[in-house]
UniProtKB/Swiss-Prot annotation:
Compositional bias (Low complexity): 464-476
Entries under InterPro entries matching the protein: AMER (IPR019003)
Coiled-coil zones: none
Source species of the chain: Xenopus tropicalis (Western clawed frog)
A Pfam short name: AMER
Compositional bias per record (Polar residues), positions renumbered to this chain: 477-489, 504-517
Membrane association type: Peripheral membrane protein
Function comment: Negative regulator of the canonical Wnt signaling pathway involved in neuroectodermal patterning. Acts by specifically binding phosphatidylinositol 4,5-bisphosphate (PtdIns(4,5)P2), translocating to the cell membrane and interacting with key regulators of the canonical Wnt signaling pathway, such as components of the beta-catenin destruction complex.
GO MF entries: phosphatidylinositol-4,5-bisphosphate binding
Localization, UniProt: Cell membrane
GO biological process: ectoderm development; negative regulation of canonical Wnt signaling pathway; Wnt signaling pathway
Protein name: APC membrane recruitment protein 2
Length: 566
C-alpha cells in the first residue's frame, strides 16, 4: 500500500495549481508540449532516465507506472545492456506464442507475460533494472490498450501481497507484482477454472534464492519454463476430472427419478385402454371409488394432472351415456325410467357398460319409431278435420285459399322461395305425400316445439289446393309481398298479386266492382271459417274479428300482413 500512496502523492506535488482533471493525469500522465496524445501511448525517451521516472510517477494507477517506480530507484543505471534486452523480446515472444492457442488474439498478452517473467527473475539485481526500463519501453509500445486494461484489472489483487510484506523494501513489491500479474495473464489466456491453479503457481514460481547477476540465456530458460508450466495444467486437470464426478451424482439421481416416473403413466395408459374397450369410464370410476386415493397417491408425486384427467374421462363418459335424457316432451315416462334403470351402479363391470350401450342404441331406435308414430298420429287428426271445414266453406274454397296464403306470409319468416308459376302446378298435388315424407326432417322437428293448432292449420292450408288447383292457371306475375313457405308446404303456396284477384272476382261475380278496384273484399267471406283455428300466436287475436262486419275485417286482414312485412 505504501507504493500506491507514494505514486499518488508525487504527481499531486508536481502538477501546477491550474490543473483540474487530476484523475486524468493520474491515468494518462502529463501532456508534452509537442504532442497531442498522452505519453502512455507514446514512446519513452530511452536516454532520459529522469524523464522516464517522472512519467512513471504520474501514471500511478497502472501497473506500468508501478513498474516504473521500481525502476526510478535505480536512476543511476545507464542503458548499458540495451542491445541484449532488445534481443530478449524477439526470442521470448515466439516461444510463448507457440504455446498459446490463439496467436493473433493473445500475442500482446504473451509479450507482457514474457516481460514480467524477466522482472521476476531479475528483480533483485540492480544492474539489470536499467535493462528492464528499456525493455519495458519497447514492450509497451507494441502492447497497446489490451495489455493496459489487463494490467489495470488485476491491480486490486496485488494489495493482498503488499499487505503481507509491508516491512519489505521497495524491490520486493516489484517482485511480487510481476509474479501476480503473470498469474493473471495466464488466467486470462486459459479457461475460467484455472485461476486457482495459476495463483498457486505464481507463489511457487517465485524463486527464493536467485543470483543477483544472471545472463540473458538464463532469463530465456526461465521464461520457457514458466510458459511450459502454464501449458501443463497438472493440478487443474485433476480438478477438472474431479468435477465431472461430482456432477455425475445428481445426474444419476435425476436419471433414476426419470426411470421411476413412467411407471404410473403406464398404468394410466392401461386404464385408458380399458376405457376405450368398455366405451365408458365406469371401470375406472369403480377403481377410484373402491381403492380410495390409491391411484391418486401413485400419481401425485409423478404427475398430479393424471388423476384429474381420469376423472374428466368419467364425466365425459356419463355425459355420453345420459345424453338421451334430454328428450322432447312427447317421450313417455317409461322411457325415462328405462334410462334410469340402465345406468349401472358403482360395482358394475365392463359387461354392464356394454349392456348399457346396447340398450341406449335400442332406445334410440325406439325413440325414432315413437316420434314417427306420434307424428303420424297427429297428422291424421289434422287431415280428418279438413273436410269439416271444407263443407262449411262450400263455394268459397278459392277465396279461402287466397286468404290463407296471405296470412301465412306474416308467420313463416325464415323460409324463402321464388314465385311459383304454371310449371309448379303439378307438384302442388303431391302435398300430402310431402307431409308424410317430412316426418323425420328438420321441419318436423320444428313442429314439435310449436303449437298443435299451428300444425293443424298447416295441414288445413295444404288440403284445399288438391281439389282447387284448377282455379289458378295463371302465369307468374309480380307479387305484392314476398312469399315465405315451409319446405313441406312450398308447392302449395300461391302469392297474392293484384292480377290474381280480378280473375277470382269474375268467378264470384257478386263483388266484382269493389274487388277490381281494391281486391280487399274477396277474402272477406273466408275470414270466419278461417279464424276458427288460429294459425299461430300472432293470428290468435283475429278470433275477436267475428263480431266485426265482413268488409272491415277483410281490410284489416289484408293490411296487417303487409305492415308486418315492411
Amino acid at each position: 500500500m505504501d507504493l500506491h500512496y507514494d505514486c499518488a502523492e508525487s504527481p499531486a506535488a508536481e502538477q501546477p495549481s491550474g490543473k483540474i482533471n487530476k484523475t486524468a493525469f493520474k491515468l494518462f500522465g502529463k501532456r508534452k508540449s509537442g504532442s497531442g496524445m498522452p505519453t502512455i501511448f507514446g514512446v519513452k525517451n530511452k536516454g532520459d532516465s529522469k524523464g522516464t521516472g517522472k512519467i512513471g510517477m504520474v501514471r500511478s494507477k497502472t501497473l506500468d507506472g508501478l513498474a516504473d517506480v521500481v525502476l526510478e530507484s535505480n536512476k543511476k543505471e545507464e542503458p548499458c545492456t540495451e542491445a541484449g534486452a532488445g534481443q530478449l523480446n524477439p526470442e521470448k515472444s515466439p516461444k510463448v506464442l507457440t504455446i498459446n492457442a490463439d496467436v493473433s488474439s493473445n500475442s500482446s498478452v504473451a509479450k507482457s507475460h514474457s516481460f514480467f517473467s524477466l522482472l521476476k527473475k531479475n528483480g533483485k539485481s540492480e544492474n539489470v533494472r536499467g535493462e528492464q526500463a528499456e525493455q519495458k519501453a519497447g514492450s509497451r509500445q507494441k502492447r497497446g490498450l489490451k495489455g493496459l486494461f489487463n494490467s489495470m484489472r488485476w491491480s486490486k489483487k496485488d494489495k493482498s501481497y503488499k499487505d503481507d510484506k509491508e516491512g519489505a523494501s521497495e524491490s520486493q513489491p516489484g517482485l511480487i507484482l510481476p509474479s501476480s500479474l503473470t498469474a493473471s495473464l495466464e488466467c486470462i489466456k486459459e479457461e475460467t477454472q484455472k485461476p486457482l491453479c495459476e495463483k498457486g503457481k505464481s507463489t511457487e514460481d517465485i524463486p527464493a534464492d536467485v543470483p543477483l547477476a544472471e545472463h540473458s540465456g538464463d532469463v530465456n530458460t526461465s521464461a520457457e519454463e514458466n510458459s511450459l508450466k502454464a501449458s501443463e495444467e497438472s493440478p487443474c486437470s485433476a480438478l477438472i476430472t474431479e468435477q465431472p464426478q461430482l456432477e455425475d451424482a445428481p445426474l444419476a439421481q435425476l436419471q433414476e427419478n426419470l426411470c421411476q416416473l413412467p411407471q404410473p403413466e403406464v398404468e394410466t395408459l392401461q386404464n385408458n385402454k380399458d376405457e376405450h374397450v368398455t366405451g365408458c369410464g365406469d371401470v375406472i370410476a369403480d377403481q377410484d371409488d373402491d381403492g380410495g386415493s390409491s391411484m391418486g397417491s401413485k400419481l401425485v408425486p409423478g404427475n398430479g394432472k393424471k388423476v384429474m384427467s381420469k376423472k374428466n374421462t368419467n364425466i365425459v363418459a356419463y355425459q355420453g351415456g345420459g345424453e338421451e335424457m334430454a328428450s322432447p316432451e312427447q317421450v313417455d315416462e317409461t322411457y325415462v325410467q328405462e334410462l334410469f334403470s340402465m345406468i349401472p351402479p358403482s360395482e358394475g363391470a365392463s359387461e354392464k357398460t356394454e349392456k348399457v350401450n346396447g340398450t341406449t342404441q335400442a332406445s334410440r331406435e325406439v325413440k325414432c319409431s315413437d316420434s314417427a308414430q306420434d307424428r303420424n298420429a297427429i297428422k291424421p287428426s289434422k287431415l280428418k278435420q279438413v273436410p269439416v271445414y271444407r263443407k262449411e266453406r262450400g263455394d268459397q274454397n278459392s277465396k279461402a285459399n287466397e286468404k290463407r296464403q296471405c296470412l301465412r306470409n306474416s308467420d313463416e319468416g325464415y323460409w324463402d322461395s321464388p314465385t311459383p308459376g304454371q310449371e309448379e302446378e303439378e307438384p302442388r298435388s303431391v302435398g300430402k305425400q310431402a307431409l308424410a315424407r317430412d316426418s323425420c326432417s328438420g321441419d318436423a322437428l320444428y313442429d314439435l316445439y310449436t303449437d298443435p293448432d299451428e300444425s293443424i292449420a298447416k295441414a288445413q292450408v295444404e288440403e284445399p289446393p288438391l281439389s282447387h288447383s284448377h282455379s289458378k292457371p295463371l302465369s307468374p306475375v309480380t307479387t305484392s309481398c314476398p312469399v315465405k313457405t315451409a319446405s313441406s308446404n312450398k308447392e302449395s303456396k300461391i302469392p297474392i298479386s293484384i292480377k290474381h284477384l280480378p280473375v277470382h272476382t269474375t268467378n264470384q261475380g257478386t263483388d266484382s266492382s269493389s274487388g277490381s278496384a281494391t281486391g280487399h273484399p274477396h277474402p272477406v267471406k273466408s275470414e270466419l271459417p278461417r279464424t276458427k283455428i288460429p294459425v299461430s300466436k300472432v293470428l290468435v287475436r283475429r278470433v275477436s274479428n267475428k263480431a266485426i262486419t265482413e268488409t272491415a275485417a277483410g281490410k284489416r286482414a289484408i293490411h296487417d300482413p303487409a305492415r308486418k312485412h315492411h
